[in-house]
């Protein structure tokens, strides 16, 4: 067994990690989690409307959400912060919606900010992070992707057009099947392939199959994390200790 693990290039720095792996396998260490996750996992439960808590300062409340905020503040012996002045509110709106500071003496114009193309540019960044978007392949060669911008711009336009989330999700998962004659729907499926990609050509059939499985793991894992909030990467080799 040891011979198959021993580094062939006589790099002694590699021996340590292999020894640790062999010891773990031989010791048959138990899983440290006390209970295995199942269908009773908290994030898989049906959404229920919670009971709105009672508060003392009822005049401060404007909507049910305020009840929850104020109830926690009162529980900790705290009082709400004073209402922000118009200048502060304007700065918050600008930075939150478009990520840019307001001009001097600007007044809050919410509809104008939501209609600004900068709104989609700012918030698309967060979705592109979830989608593991990159404009190069990564790995050691890190080749540029000259057409990666098309998916990026589709996300920006979708946000600026206030596309419903269900359509936003469906097109990215199967736009080429749902609307095969719509170039935009096909562009949306860039979500599936916009992650890191090893540009090395496989040296044989075995390596080709391994690389294909790596690609499928990345695709399935990204879809599940993005739209289900669950990690399924581990299912490639074993049951997950924590997620169902």
Regions found by a protein language model. Give the residues of each.
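Short, structured secondary-structure elements
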Residues: 35-244
């Amino acid at each position: 067994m040891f011979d198959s693990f021993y580094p062939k290039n006589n790099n002694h720095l590699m021996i340590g990690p292999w020894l640790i792996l062999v010891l773990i396998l031989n010791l048959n260490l138990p899983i440290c989690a006390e209970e295995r996750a199942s269908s009773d996992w908290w994030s898989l439960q049906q959404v229920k409307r919670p009971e709105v808590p009672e508060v003392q300062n009822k005049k401060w409340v404007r909507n049910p959400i305020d009840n929850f905020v104020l109830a926690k503040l009162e529980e900790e012996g705290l009082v709400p912060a004073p209402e922000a002045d118009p200048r502060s509110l304007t700065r918050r709106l600008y930075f939150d919606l478009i990520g840019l500071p307001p001009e001097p003496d600007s007044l809050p114009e919410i509809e104008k900010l939501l209609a600004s193309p900068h709104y989609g540019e700012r918030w698309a960044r967060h979705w592109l992070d979830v989608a593991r978007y990159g404009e190069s392949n990564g790995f050691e060669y890190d080749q540029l992707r000259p057409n990666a911008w098309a998916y990026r711009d589709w996300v920006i336009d979708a946000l600026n057009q206030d596309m419903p989330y269900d359509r936003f999700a469906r097109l990215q998962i199967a736009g080429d099947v749902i609307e095969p004659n719509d170039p935009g729907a096909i562009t949306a499926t860039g979500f599936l392939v916009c992650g890191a990609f090893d540009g090395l050509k496989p040296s044989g059939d075995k390596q080709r199959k391994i690389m294909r499985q790596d690609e499928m793991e990345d695709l399935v894992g990204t879809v599940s994390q993005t739209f289900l909030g669950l990690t399924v990467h581990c299912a490639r080799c074993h049951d997950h200790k924590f997620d169902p």
